[in-house]
């Protein structure tokens, strides 16, 4: 029996080989006890403030919205140590690993940001780190590969399948199946078998808590909409979490890639089917035979054929709205923010920004406050941009 509800509505669960069930139960037990442990919480928030650099700013884009009645704010997770929101939850998971007396960390990565964050946490806590990464992603994110190796991580190239994030996830799970007694699998997003979606949300929820406090200080009211890009969904659930019970539009932006009609996209929430993948029940991209269909996005961090179960649930009850943005639209938003505000966003975050700009342009006379989560800084983005 689990200590926490493993489902979000019909989504979630623990669809893993029986051999991994004790490891998941152990993880859940230690997570629940850590949440009640004042010393654990004190150390976690100390690290967030004094090592990671929280709180992150909420920046008003004055030039971007000139001539309209829209205000667009950016939640600057790109300024966090490591360059992404990923650092938040890996610090928490590393502390859980130590609590469980695990000395080795297994991780998967797509864009490389979770790999970098995992390497950061392992260096800080003196843990052995091995990171699985698709060969395709290694080629387009070699700067992050260098950063991981510099901090002592072993980067394992995955050549199976499409050589992207889904294949790295599969290999990481295989590794954990044979090494779980001494290793902790540090999943990088709010997906996977229970209790990972809950753990990641709880270790990311300070994004939403800070955002609410900051916008109330600046505007004395809540925003009209919160907008975040969706791959697995950790940055989005982090910023959504504190607004779920408020009258605020929650908008998740999936990658439409070359266009939904082409089939070259990564939008399982609105254009996929319910199925079992990566240890969970959620929406995923499938072909007519029910096999996993390859996803596509110019952004490696969004190139994932499924999505976290809490997002699937929020979609099913119509609490959050999920839309899609093409590669071309994301590139345009990337250019506009860079030139208008001097802030260079990652391609992941450019999807969220692109939808915010769409809302602004729809009717410039409407007074509205929009917050886009700028979840990642991408030092490799220039090569991707030039190749596009």
UniProtKB/Swiss-Prot annotation:
Q: Which reaction does it catalyse?
A: (1S,2R)-1-C-(indol-3-yl)glycerol 3-phosphate + L-serine = D-glyceraldehyde 3-phosphate + L-tryptophan + H2O
Q: Does the keyword Amino-acid biosynthesis apply?
A: yes
Name the needed cofactors: pyridoxal 5'-phosphate
Q: Name one GO molecular function term.
A: tryptophan synthase activity
Q: Which PROSITE patterns match?
A: TRP_SYNTHASE_BETA (PS00168)
**What InterPro entries does this protein's entry cite?**
Trp_synth_b_CS (IPR006653), Trp_synth_beta (IPR006654), Trp_synth_beta/beta-like (IPR023026), TrpB-like_PALP (IPR001926), TrpB-like_PALP_sf (IPR036052)
Pathway field of the UniProt record reads: Amino-acid biosynthesis; L-tryptophan biosynthesis; L-tryptophan from chorismate: step 5/5
The protein, known as: Tryptophan synthase beta chain
Species, as recorded: Buchnera aphidicola subsp. Acyrthosiphon pisum (strain APS)
Q: Which gene encodes it?
A: trpB
């Amino acid at each position: 029996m689990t200590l926490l509800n493993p489902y979000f509505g019909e989504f979630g669960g623990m669809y893993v080989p029986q051999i991994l069930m004790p490891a998941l139960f152990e993880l859940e037990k230690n997570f629940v006890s850590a949440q009640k442990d004042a010393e654990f919480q004190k150390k976690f928030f100390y690290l967030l403030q004094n090592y990671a650099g929280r709180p992150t700013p909420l920046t008003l884009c004055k030039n971007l919205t000139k001539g309209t009645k829209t205000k667009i704010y950016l939640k600057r997770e790109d300024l966090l140590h490591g360059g992404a929101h990923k650092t938040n939850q890996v610090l928490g998971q590393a502390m859980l690993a130590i609590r469980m007396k695990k000395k080795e960390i297994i991780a998967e990565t797509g864009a490389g940001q979770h790999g970098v964050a995992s390497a950061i946490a392992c260096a800080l806590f003196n843990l052995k780190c091995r990171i699985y990464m698709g060969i395709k992603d290694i080629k387009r994110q070699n700067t992050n590969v260098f950063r991981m190796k510099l901090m002592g991580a072993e980067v394992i190239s995955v050549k199976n399948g499409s050589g992207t994030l889904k294949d790295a996830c599969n290999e990481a799970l295989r590794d954990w199946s044979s090494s779980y007694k001494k290793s902790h699998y540090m999943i990088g997003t709010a997906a996977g078998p229970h209790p990972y979606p809950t753990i990641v949300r709880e270790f990311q929820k300070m994004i939403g808590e800070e955002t609410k406090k900051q916008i109330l200080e600046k505007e004395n009211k809540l925003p009209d909409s919160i907008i975040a890009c969706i791959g697995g969904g950790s940055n989005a659930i982090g910023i959504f979490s504190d607004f779920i019970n408020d009258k605020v539009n929650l908008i998740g932006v999936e990658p439409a890639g070359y266009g939904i009609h082409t089939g070259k996209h990564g939008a399982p929430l609105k254009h996929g089917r319910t199925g079992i993948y990566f240890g969970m029940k959620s929406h995923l991209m499938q072909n007519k035979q029910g096999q996993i269909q390859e996803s596509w996005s110019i952004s490696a961090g969004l190139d994932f054929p499924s999505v976290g179960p809490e997002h699937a649930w929020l979609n099913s009850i119509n609490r959050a709205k999920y839309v899609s943005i093409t590669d071309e639209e994301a590139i345009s938003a990337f250019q506009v923010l860079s030139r208008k505000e001097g802030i260079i966003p990652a391609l992941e975050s450019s999807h969220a920004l692109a939808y915010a700009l769409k809302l602004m342009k729809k009717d410039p006379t409407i007074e509205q406050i929009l917050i886009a989560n700028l979840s990642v800084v991408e030092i490799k983005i220039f090569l991707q941009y030039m190749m596009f």
